Curated annotation (Swiss-Prot):
Sites where the protein binds Zn(2+): C220, C296, C303, C306
Species of the source: Saccharum hybrid (Sugarcane)
Name this protein carries in UniProt: DNA-directed RNA polymerase subunit beta''
Cofactor(s), by name: Zn(2+)
Reactions catalysed, as given in the entry: RNA(n) + a ribonucleoside 5'-triphosphate = RNA(n+1) + diphosphate
Cofactor binding note: Binds 1 Zn(2+) ion per subunit.
Region (Disordered): 644-698, 719-800
Length: 1534
């Protein structure tokens, strides 16, 4: 008793960890038996106390933390600030997400710590506290949810939801919080189920691979070891953990004194001596060599000394112990346990939390600014990054502190700044250890409002989306969404016109209907058309073409902005350029009218190629009346035979295209002769490599036609016309109604009579239906699905025009002259197969006869019915029927002029008109023919027109550099049916204007429309100038990109911004009486050339102008590079004008000075009041779609005071983007936006929302694109730390064990193995190279793998002894593959054999065996053992047994599993002795070791000789353990 009283008494509660430590010390001191006795007493005491305490848990025991309220409030305040920064565009979405997660995570963690101390101080006996912190049940994070806050949760994809749950379970959750928290719960339930199974299977595989590893001998005699040294940055704790329980491989000396001998096991005492020695002489201490399972020389078992102490009782492991199975279970078991903790605390971004350096005292901080450069932190804050270790001094009042900041750290304060004590001054980049837990994640940012996209830097194409509309940002910059108000209603009349609003004045006052094509904005918007005219007049919109405006009324022109990036191009002289003036009707000059159906067409980006058509003239004389469908016949004056024959051959397949095109073509004929340029539709892809494709979102349809690269193309195409209208208006009809050429569905009819009409064949199922009222919609909709598959790459050569890269060119090669042509009426109906006809085949009917239930005929005549597989064709031929006596003498298909008698017919009478004679065969009779005589309308071609009659004189004076030619062509294929709907006209002949030039080196001509307004006159000019383009462009299938020329290899943003460059000029409605002409314009108005530096505009002055003889000269005061020339509208007053382009120059504020020549100042008085200019941030012209309305409430007015104006001259310019809260003048800017009106005393902002985007972010869409709310705007790719709960950890462990490729492991390891395999044999030669190379490779990879696995478990707080992992890794890496380099007599190439076996075989045979190290996974290693019974019981039973039988394998039953399967005694424990026979070899062990030492010394010499090479080529002599946690260095002491 007296003795006991002297013992120290500790009055202190202990937790689970303390008990663990106590037990291990008890075992060390007293051994197993006595310890178990003590623990029994503790157990009894525990149960007794628990019973008497009788813990109960009620809701009142859940005490919330008092400080929670203000902590949460503080976090909310920070979040609010963050939102504001985001709104101002100061941080981008990822930075915002990161910071918000970290703010809430820190709050949550702080609360967790508070909770612990709060319980301890206020209520230490609280049952919640007792339970959770005793380690009995529940853990801190679960209690934290009960009484702290739940914090951030992950969604089912593992992404953070950045809305934290602020309540705890005691307070109760709101509905939103409840739903968010259910995510985690669901994920937890699923994970627990799935992962438990995974973990169990992992354990099974691990045990499988090492079940035969048993301790069978005391010593294997190895002399290899692995060196451990605390010098390599290893922590003391790890050093101790690594050494305790191991066996030394070599003697250890301190100075000359040996303090530990070889084969001695290391206990805590020895380790402490090592540590003391290292501390005393850190640089002289030698590394400690230990034995590990890796160095054991046995193949299928392990020796006591290589294994070391048994973890259970602290002595050397006993013989006969199944250490393999223990290892497998030790690794697998934590996995099974950890899957039950799948609770997500959600610290997603915390894996890379940085260490902070704080200021030691108040004072002024100083550092060398040359050694740092500015950067952004992960949270978007400004900081300095230091290149090298930086020395920072903090000067307080009486003391100078100096702080060292390691390299690559971020300094968060400025030089000479005053810092307070404990203020964070720097952030150390988190160590490389977190590297492997990073993953790349995409974050999509969606637009928060409708608007127009602008960006403030150049962009380039994402290489993998070369042909898409995705772009990459080369530097951090802002994207702006400029607010617009979409006008989607077609008849909405806006009464929003107020003073100083920008409106398209005439757009909404015109009667008629406007259909805006929003395909520019996004293809997903479904467009609804408001139908004002009823079914008949339904418009069909083609959604694939870019910005097109269709109207039945008149429309204001809109203008392309075609500017080069380098203004020098504009500054050339007048040569290579001409200007075409467009004329207004004088009374209605607000409407632009092109009389006589002249249509101008400027191709995409305004670039014309040689021989391009740029204007059409539809002569009313060649317009067909509304009589209906029919056939056009004509003769060529020079008709080459080869064309003729091939044309016959193709005629049948041409039929469907033609008719369908014709049928649509006239639907808009009265209202509109101008359609979108078809150059989108036909594209050649001639020189693919040569053309850079940079177009953006104009999707091309060039794939709708088949390309035939031979010279003639499809010959039928030569005879086709440049029929633009129907295709443009209705989408390309070839796409919708196309024949399926590849599918063999053509029958070429042999009947002579059918051949004559080029009848449509089977392929045309729904390709063209007549557009009667009933089938009109069907034919458009149904056929689209069936024939929507476009064919690639087509080139169309129509009637001598070659489609070349999107513009139509005139080719002399195929030009033919036609003197007259004829139109013959005929009707065709395509009816569904099932329809019941009311007329018979070969019957003769009158006009308006009922054909089917709801179809009536429009012509009278002969009916022919032809039934096809899928439909019925019904043709009606008008005309008289004759039965001639000598049918053979009649030439079918001939045209007979008037006044000629027809002798063969029964009657003979004079004809006033031409007739067309056809021969028809009577059915079921081979000889009998009848003749159909059909009336024909003749049209003569007029050769009288020439340039002089159509174009003004001063245009012709340009001919020295650009030539214009007129060409007539016929719009229809010879003898092809033109199907019509009946309330429209059809144009037979078109006259087109072709532009050409001589200079070979010029690539193309650029065309642009210029509109110039003065007080009472608005004039428009088409300007064409020759340009030598750097890169021509073509389009490709599904090409959504569009950027024009790229001068100097960078994007030209004016081009991306330009409209679909095409003037809309409506034809005159028939009832208007005034006829002016675009071509011969009224000579009353003198024209005046104003030659600015760009020398490109012509301005028609108003009547009786005072300045008829204005000077033609440049103003020398304007620097050439600083002016864009007069490319805009000079607006008389702001109250009414259209959104076209406005005047601008580079010297923004000086708008009213120096702009024009002095003597023009009076004329342009309007400049004094110039209110509007539109430019983008880089001072390029910006433009609006005609469908954007700027509403008044989007504009913010800011008034400048005169005193502040002078200072801000440098700051404000038009088009500049300004962020909210910027302090420009005395007041702050209240809203972000773009300046687009600058007055003397105020400016107007157009509201805009900035989004910050980082380098490499992907921008969706193109400059100037219209976005809708919710459209995807930018995609960021950022790295985040994986939330390293075991749900991610376990799969990773499994991947490493399976040697499967994972992000960070395999590239390094595989590369390293390759390097070793290659370099070592090269250095050392054969056979040493292979032997040593394979060994070093295996050693490297083993240690690397052990590290990676340990890292995953340690991150979870799980301690597993290295030796367990080593035993498994040893099995995974113990095989080599025999290579094909040297054929050996022993092994087959590709065979897997053990490394030791290969070495022994090589030594025994005295010949070199070539092999390479290989990394097997645990599954493959389990299937490559010495026991086929073990393999078969694992996987693929039948295959394994069959192979074993074929090979005649013998199983020696050395492992546990084989014996269990066969019911024998297992060779461990008590059954061990039966299997181990003392071999006579053991007596000779000493001599063996002697011999081996001889062999080893040779190898050692070789290694030392090549030390430098080895170490420079690899990481071997460097940090063996790769990471800072466990550095090992393998040295082979041989």
């Amino acid at each position: 008793m007296a003795e006991r009283a002297n013992l120290v008494f500790h009055n202190k509660e202990i937790d689970g960890t303390a008990i663990k430590r106590l037990i291990s010390r008890l075992i060390d001191h007293f051994g197993m038996g006595y310890t178990s006795h003590i623990l029994d007493q503790i157990k009894t005491l525990g149960f007794h106390q628990a019973t008497t305490t009788s813990i109960s848990l009620g809701i009142e025991d859940l005490l919330t933390i008092p400080s929670k309220g203000w902590l949460v409030q503080d976090a909310e305040q920070q979040s609010f600030l963050l939102e504001k920064h985001y709104y101002y565009g100061a941080v981008h979405a990822v930075e915002k997400l990161r910071q918000s997660v970290e703010i809430w995570y820190a709050t949550s963690e702080y609360l967790k710590q508070e909770m612990n101390s709060n319980f301890r101080i206020t209520d230490p006996s609280n049952p919640v506290y007792l339970m959770s912190f005793s380690g009995a049940r529940g853990n801190a994070s679960q209690v934290h949810q009960l009484v702290g806050m739940r914090g951030l949760m992950a969604d089912p994809q593992g992404q953070m939801i950045d809305l934290p749950i602020q309540s705890n379970l005691r307070e109760g959750l709101s509905l939103t919080e409840y739903i968010i928290s259910c995510y985690g719960a669901r994920k937890g339930v699923v994970d627990t189920a799935v992962r438990t199974a995974d973990a169990g299977y992992l354990t099974r595989r691990l045990v499988e691979v090492v079940q035969h590893i048993i301790v069978r001998r005391r010593d294997c005699g190895t002399i290899q070891g692995i060196s451990v040294s605390p010098q390599n940055g290893m922590t003391e704790k790890l050093f101790v953990q690594t050494l305790i329980g191991r066996v030394l491989a070599d003697d250890i000396y301190i100075g000359s004194r040996c303090i530990a001998s070889r084969n001695q096991d290391i206990g805590i005492g020895l380790v402490n001596r090592f540590i003391t020695a290292f501390r005393a002489q850190p640089f002289r201490a030698q590394p400690i060599y230990i034995r590990t399972p890796f160095t054991c020389r046995s193949t299928s078992w392990i020796c006591q000394l290589c294994y070391g102490r048994s973890p259970t009782h602290g002595d050397l492991v006993e013989l006969g112990e199944a250490v393999g199975i223990i290892a497998g279970q030790s690794i697998g078991e934590p996995g099974t346990q950890l899957t039950l903790r799948t609770f997500h605390t959600g610290g997603v971004f915390t894996g890379g939390t940085a260490d902070l350096i704080r200021s030691p005292s108040n004072g002024k901080i100083q550092f060398n600014e040359d050694l740092v450069h500015p950067t952004r932190t992960r949270h978007g804050q400004p900081a300095f990054l230091c290149y090298i270790d930086l020395h920072v001094t903090i000067q307080s009042q009486d003391i100078l502190h100096s702080v060292n900041i390691p390299l690559k750290s971020l300094i968060l304060v400025q030089n000479d700044q005053y810092v307070e004590s404990e203020q964070v001054i720097a952030e150390i980049r988190a160590g490389m250890s977190t590297l492997h837990f990073k993953e790349k994640v995409q974050k999509h940012i969606y637009s928060e409002s409708d608007g127009e996209m602008h960006w403030s830097t150049d962009v380039y194409h994402a290489p993998e989306y070369q042909y898409g509309n995705l772009r990459r940002l080369p530097k951090t910059s802002h994207l702006w969404i400029l607010s617009v108000s979409m006008c989607r209603s077609s008849i909405a009349s806006f009464s929003l016109h107020k003073d100083q609003d920008q409106m398209n004045t005439y757009s909404f006052s015109v009667d008629g209907r406007y259909i805006f094509d929003f395909s520019m904005a996004n293809d997903q918007v479904s467009h609804r058309l408001l139908d004002t005219f009823g079914k008949k007049d339904r418009e069909i919109l083609d959604y694939l073409t870019p910005d097109r405006i269709v109207s039945n009324g008149h429309w204001n022109c809109f203008y392309p902005s075609i500017l080069q990036d380098n203004s020098d191009l504009l500054a050339k002289k007048r040569r290579n350029r001409f200007v075409v003036p467009l004329q207004y009707h004088q009374e209605q000059e607000k409407e632009r009218i092109s009389c006589l159906g002249i249509s101008m067409e400027i191709p995409f980006m305004g670039v014309l190629r040689r021989n391009t058509i740029f204007a059409y003239f539809d002569d009313p004389r060649y317009r067909k009346d509304k009589r209906g469908s029919g056939i056009v016949k004509f003769r060529y004056r020079t008709l080459e035979e080869e064309y003729r024959t091939q044309e016959e051959e193709y005629r049948t397949r041409e039929e469907e295209y033609r008719t369908r095109e014709e049928e649509y073509r006239t639907r808009e004929e009265d209202s509109e002769d101008e359609y979108e340029s078809p150059e989108n539709k036909y594209r050649t892809r001639e020189g693919e490599g040569e053309y850079e494709i940079l177009e953006d979102e104009y999707r091309t349809l060039e794939d709708e036609y088949e390309t035939l690269e031979d010279e003639y193309g499809i010959l039928e195409d030569e005879y086709r016309t440049l029929e633009k209208d129907s295709e443009e208006e209705y989408g390309s009809l070839e796409n919708k109604y196309r024949t399926r050429e590849g599918e063999g569905e053509y029958e070429i009819l042999e009947e002579d009579s059918e051949e004559e009409y080029g009848s449509s064949e089977d392929g045309s199922e729904k390709e063209y239906g007549t557009l009667e009222e009933d089938s009109e919609e069907d034919s458009e909709e149904d056929s689209e699905d069936e024939y929507g598959s476009p064919e690639e790459n087509s080139i169309l050569k129509k009637e001598g025009f070659i489609e070349h890269r999107g513009t139509k060119e005139f080719s002399l090669k195929y030009q033919k002259e036609v003197d007259r042509f004829f139109f013959i009426l005929q009707e065709l109906h395509i009816l569904p197969r099932s329809s019941s006809l009311k007329v018979l085949d070969n019957s003769i009917i009158g006009v308006d006869t009922q054909l089917t239930k709801n179809t009536r005929s429009r012509l009278g005549g002969l009916v022919r019915v032809k039934r096809k597989k899928s439909h019925t064709e019904l043709k009606i031929f008008s005309g008289d029927i004759h039965f001639p006596e000598e049918a053979d003498k009649i030439l079918g298909g001939s045209l007979i002029p008037p006044e000629r008698e027809k002798k063969d017919s029964k009657e003979s009478k004079k004809r006033k008109n031409w007739v067309y004679v056809q021969r028809k065969k009577i059915l079921k009779s081979k000889e009998k023919y009848f003749v159909l005589v059909r009336p024909a309308v003749a049209y003569e071609m007029d050769e009288g027109r020439n340039l002089a009659t159509l174009f003004p004189q001063d245009l012709l004076q340009e001919e020295d550099n650009l030539q214009l030619r007129l060409v007539n062509f016929i719009s229809h294929e010879n003898s092809k049916l033109t199907q019509r709907i009946y309330h429209t006209n059809s144009q037979f002949v078109r006259t087109c204007l072709v532009v050409n030039w001589e200079q070979e080196e010029k690539e193309g001509a650029r065309a642009s429309l210029v509109e110039v307004r003065t007080n009472d006159l608005i004039r428009d000019f088409l300007r064409i100038e020759l340009v030598k383009s750097t890169i021509s462009y073509t389009r490709r299938r599904y090409d959504r990109t569009s950027v024009g020329l790229i001068p100097n290899n960078r994007l030209d943003r004016n081009n991306t911004n330009s409209f679909y460059s095409k003037a809309k000029i409506q034809s005159l409605s028939q009832h208007q009486e005034v006829i002016g002409t675009l071509l011969n314009r009224n000579k009353e108005y003198p024209s005046l050339m104003i030659l600015l530096a760009s020398n490109c505009s012509r301005i028609g002055l108003f009547k009786n102008s005072k300045y008829p003889n204005a000077v033609k000269e440049s103003n020398p005061r304007i620097p050439i590079r600083d002016i864009f020339g007069l490319l805009g509208v000079i607006v008389p007053s702001i109250s009414n004008f259209s959104s076209s382009y406005y005047l601008l120059t580079h010297n923004q504020i000086l708008l009213k000075k120096y702009l024009f020549l002095d003597n023009l100042k009076q004329t342009f008085q309007v400049l004094q009041g110039l209110k509007y200019s539109l430019i983008d941030e880089n001072k390029r012209i910006s433009n609006f779609d005609s469908n954007i309305m700027l509403e008044p409430f989007h504009l913010n007015w800011h008034f400048l005071h005169h005193d502040s104006w002078e200072e801000t001259l440098a700051i404000i310019h038009l088009g500049q983007f300004i962020c909210e809260n910027l302090c420009l003048f005395k007041s702050h800017i209240k809203k972000s936006g773009q300046i687009f009106i600058v007055n003397m005393d105020s400016f107007v902002l157009r509201a805009a929302k900035p989004y910050l985007a980082t380098i490499g972010a992907t921008v969706h869409g193109h400059y100037g694109k219209i976005l809708y709310k919710g459209d995807r705007l930018v995609t960021f790719i950022y790295e985040k730390s994986r939330s390293s709960d075991i749900t991610q950890g376990l799969p990773k462990v499994e991947q490493i064990f399976e040697a499967r490729s994972i992000d960070s492991l395999s590239p390094n390891l595989e590369r390293r193995i390759e390097d070793w395999n290659e370099r070592i044999p090269r250095i050392l030669g054969v056979p040493w190279g292979f032997l040593i190379g394979a060994e070093l490779t295996i050693a490297q990879s083993r240690i690397s793998l052990v590290n990676k696995i340990q890292k995953v478990y340690r991150s979870q707080g799980v301690q597993i002894h290295n030796r367990h992992i080593e035993i498994i890794i040893r099995q995974v890496t113990s095989k080599v593959r025999v290579s094909e380099d040297g054929m050996s007599n022993v092994f087959l190439p590709g065979e897997l054999i053990g490394l030791l076996r290969a070495e022994r075989a090589g030594r025994a045979l005295d010949e070199s065996i070539y092999y390479r190290a290989i990394l097997l996974g645990i599954t493959r290693a389990s299937l490559n053992t010495q026991s086929f019974i073990s393999e078969a019981s694992f996987q693929e039973t039948a295959r394994v047994l069959a192979k074993a039988a074929l090979r005649g394998r013998i199983d020696w039953l050395k492992g546990l599993k084989e014996n269990v399967v066969l019911g024998g005694i297992i060779p461990v424990g008590t059954g061990f002795q039966k299997f181990v026979h003392r071999s006579p070899q053991d007596k000779n062990l000493y001599f063996e070791i002697q011999k081996k030492n001889l062999f080893a010394s040779e190898m050692r010499d070789i290694l030392f000789l090549h030390t430098e090479l080895v170490s420079s080529d690899s990481d071997v002599t460097n940090n063996f353990y790769e990471t800072s946690e466990t550095p090992f260095t393998p040295i082979y002491t041989i």
